[in-house]
Amino acid sequence: MAKESYKRDKPHVNIGTIGHVDHGKTTLTAAITSVLSKKGFAESRAFGDIDKAPEERERGITISTAHVEYQTEKRHYAHIDCPGHADYIKNMITGAAQMDGAILVVAGTDGPMPQTREHILLARQVNVPALVVFLNKVDIADPELLELVEMELRELLTEYGFPGDDIPIIKGSALKALEGDPEGEKAILELMDAVDNYIPEPVRDVDKPFLMPVEDVFSISGRGTVGTGRIERGRIKINEEVEIVGIKDTRKSVVTGIEMFQKLLDEGQAGDNAGLLLRGVDKTELERGMVIAKPGTIKPHTKFKAEVYILKKEEGGRHTPFFTNYRPQFYFRTTDVTGAVTLPEGVEMVMPGDNLSVDVELIAPIAMDEGLRFAIREGGRTVGAGSVTKISE
């Protein structure tokens, strides 16, 4: 059977379910597909089907993630659900599944639990733009308790920098919805309505300022130097001015040619593998790890705060803990740069399998923004992953 072509008639949004273990994330994911399938907007996916999530590798780390897709009247959604708590942490820190928004699932019978808190904090740290709350299991919870849970949740969200008073909290039962109960189904439609209206539509990569990480460099005699790589965001046209950022001092140039698969183009855009011919740039002035970007849109930095996950021994990580002044390589986009790690006050050492916030100082500057992902490596072997949460210098 021929594959159905992907129709771009609705805006596309990536979302996911987050929250404490056994609060009903996977049941809710199954319920959403079940309820929307009745409107012809989804293929119903059974709980067991989603729960057996396939393993994927992202930045050298194995993560189990289930992907489902569905539509509403307004949008097309790609939805991720992770079976295990560690998978969520790895997913959010590596950006394996970039989330434009998330549904925080909280059981009305329990209220916020430790992982609820941890997932909200992580969502804040890795810049998930918006959350919507689904208060689950309300059919078996005490109504007075539900009011308290809602208040507690709003306070918790505010504490972590989300607009706790404004976030939609939808009450329902994912299990009832999955069983076809009309009240249960109504809550799911209400939830999707909140997701449609409250989670903002993401800016598409092509509409962001131009940036291309340099993967390879070669010179064309008599014409100049070419940097090749995959355009990460934005568009580039011939004769546009660019900046070369990272490792060495930032310098300006002009793109005098754009090539893709040996063909000349007038314009390159996000997702293209392209070669850019740069005016007046010597081959020695361009190297892997630099980025070519729209002037003034990104700066090189050496010091930053990051949220990191350190691999367990079983995941191919370190066998021993590390301490302040640990000096691994940080792999950003296309290259490794050595850096020193400073642990937060009160943390003596970091064990394989931990996730925490650290300060890093690199020996050479790298073009970075908050939210940039990286791998932590020792001699080419991945031992962790991280996300830049704040630039210090």
Curated annotation (Swiss-Prot):
Full protein name: Elongation factor Tu
SUPFAM superfamilies: EF-Tu/eEF-1alpha/eIF2-gamma C-terminal domain (SSF50465), P-loop containing nucleoside triphosphate hydrolases (SSF52540), Translation proteins (SSF50447)
Annotated region (G3), positions in chain: 81-84
Domain (tr-type G) ranges: 10-203
Subcellular location: Cytoplasm
Purpose: GTP hydrolase that promotes the GTP-dependent binding of aminoacyl-tRNA to the A-site of ribosomes during protein biosynthesis.
Catalyzed chemical reaction(s): GTP + H2O = GDP + phosphate + H(+)
Pfam family, one: GTP_EFTU_D2
Family: Belongs to the TRAFAC class translation factor GTPase superfamily. Classic translation factor GTPase family. EF-Tu/EF-1A subfamily.
Tagged with keyword Nuclease: no
Residue segments, region G1: 19-26
Subunit structure: Monomer.
Record region (G5): 173-175
